């Protein structure tokens, strides 16, 4: 959760931080666990199909800015930071109405719809990737902020934690919180009975069906893990989609074989992947060429020199100070507001 990384950086600078968001999303659990105050308001995304879900999303979006204004009056912040997505929009709009400076964060190489709608009300937009045709005075390319808890622990400890062998290469497979069915099916089919050691984060949807297809002790299949940093530390190569989590691979210096989700808005996952391919840290394949993945996995895991080269490239691409840069900019926005109000 990138907003937590920024909150931690602000806290280290002596700033008081509180969160606001939907009670129906993961932040309602993660934020209090991290020790921050959490205010909730009702908001949901828009369904792309006409019907009850679309009507509910529209109704909540109309009411949400007023709920956010009440939160702002109670908390009286000097600056607002929106972590991106539909939850951030109402709060950024409310901040604009209350004349409080606000900033947004974009995880992908394409400005999403929610951020495009909220962008006119923000003073800053922090980008994980460069995006063409954006006003330089408002946009900052910082990379994706990562919480300290996502930093990888020591390799041997991480492998012990997941029950993986201490010797030999390990492949990490994941497709985001919901998993990636095409990757899940491919890996279980090809490596379920033999192959390299694997840590497979399949997502809760596909996990039950896959358990019957894994036949060996060095293939560790999980629905999800709260210790993603440890999962990265345990592996030598990652097979994944190309969402915002690719920045965590870069920060950990993990070579990647990326299969962008082909139906992502504006093909942003392919754009994300391109950044890391051009930097030398990843290989990208379209989903239509999935049959090449097993061979590439084995080829890479058997080439330690190439893996080391790709790892070094990933570390060069990483932006480990993203949260610190954003925190400094937010503090400057808050200072300007106080100066203007004096």
Predicted regions and their residues:
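Acidic donor-binding loop of glycosyltransferase active sites
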Residues: 77-79, 225, 233-247, 254-255
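Glycosyltransferases and closely related glycan-assembly transferases
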Residues: 67-80, 88-103, 116-121
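Donor-nucleotide binding loops and adjacent catalytic segments primarily
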Residues: 25, 30, 34, 157-160, ...
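Active-site-proximal region of nucleotide-activated glycan assembly enzymes
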Residues: 15-16, 26, 37, 96-156
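Conserved nucleotide-sugar phosphate-binding/catalytic loop shared by glycosyltransferases and other
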Residues: 11-63, 67, 142, 204-206, ...
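C-terminal alpha-helical cap of glycosyltransferases
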Residues: 319-342
């Amino acid at each position: 959760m990138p907003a937590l990384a920024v909150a931690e950086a602000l806290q280290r600078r002596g700033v008081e931080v509180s969160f606001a968001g939907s009670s129906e999303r993961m932040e309602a659990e993660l934020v209090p666990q991290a020790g921050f105050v959490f205010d909730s308001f009702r908001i949901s995304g828009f369904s792309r199909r006409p019907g009850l879900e679309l009507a509910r999303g529209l109704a909540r979006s109309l009411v949400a800015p007023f709920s956010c204004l009440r939160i702002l009056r109670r908390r009286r912040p000097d600056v607002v930071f929106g972590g991106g997505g539909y939850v951030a929009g109402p709060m950024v709009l409310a901040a604009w109405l209350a004349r409080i400076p606000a900033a947004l964060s974009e995880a992908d190489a394409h400005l999403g719809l929610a951020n495009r709608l909220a962008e006119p009300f923000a003073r800053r937009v922090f980008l994980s990737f460069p995006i063409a045709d954006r006003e330089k005075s408002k946009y900052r390319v910082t990379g994706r902020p990562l919480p300290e808890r996502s930093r990888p622990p020591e390799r041997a400890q991480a492998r012990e934690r997941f029950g993986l062998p201490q010797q030999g290469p390990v492949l990490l497979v994941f497709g985001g919180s919901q998993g990636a069915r095409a990757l899940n099916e491919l890996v279980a089919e090809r490596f379920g009975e033999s192959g390299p050691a694997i840590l497979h984060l399949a997502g809760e949807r596909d996990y039950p069906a896959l358990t019957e297809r894994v036949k060996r002790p060095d293939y560790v299949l999980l629905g999800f893990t709260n210790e993603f940093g440890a999962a990265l530390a345990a592996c030598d190569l990652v097979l994944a989609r190309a969402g915002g989590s690719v920045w965590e691979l870069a920060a950990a210096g993990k070579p990647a074989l990326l299969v962008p989700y082909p139906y992502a808005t504006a093909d942003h996952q392919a754009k994300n992947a391109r950044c890391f391919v051009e930097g030398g840290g990843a290989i990208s394949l379209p989903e239509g060429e999935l049959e090449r993945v097993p061979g590439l996995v084995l080829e890479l895991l058997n080439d330690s020199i190439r893996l080391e080269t790709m790892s070094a490239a990933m570390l060069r691409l990483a932006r480990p100070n993203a949260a610190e840069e954003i925190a400094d900019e937010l503090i400057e926005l808050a200072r300007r507001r106080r100066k203007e109000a004096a």
